[in-house]
């Protein structure tokens, strides 16, 4: 599922 925490350059990361 997709995480609600921003990762990398403000993009959402799939976890």
Swiss-Prot record:
Cofactor binding note from Swiss-Prot or TrEMBL: Binds 1 zinc ion per subunit.
Annotated tissue distribution: Expressed by the venom gland.
BP-aspect Gene Ontology terms: proteolysis
The keyword Ribosomal protein belongs to this UniProt entry's keyword annotation: no
Amino acids binding Ca(2+): 11, 13, 15
Keyword terms: Blood coagulation cascade activating toxin, Calcium, Disulfide bond, Glycoprotein, Hemostasis impairing toxin, Hydrolase, Metal-binding, Metalloprotease, Protease, Secreted, Toxin, Zinc, Zymogen
Cofactor entry: Zn(2+)
GO cellular component: extracellular region
Note in the entry: Negative results: does not activate prothrombin or plasminogen.
Family: Belongs to the venom metalloproteinase (M12B) family. P-III subfamily. P-IIId sub-subfamily.
Job of this protein: Catalytic subunit of blood coagulation factor X-activating enzyme. Activates coagulation factor X (F10) in a calcium-dependent manner by cleaving at the '234-Arg-|-Ile-235' site. Weakly hydrolyzes insulin B chain (by cleaving at the '27-Asn-|-Gln-28' and '44-Gly-|-Glu-45' sites), fibrinogen and some components of the extracellular matrix in vitro.
Protein name stated in the entry: Factor X-activator 1 heavy chain
Species assigned in the record: Vipera ammodytes ammodytes (Western sand viper)
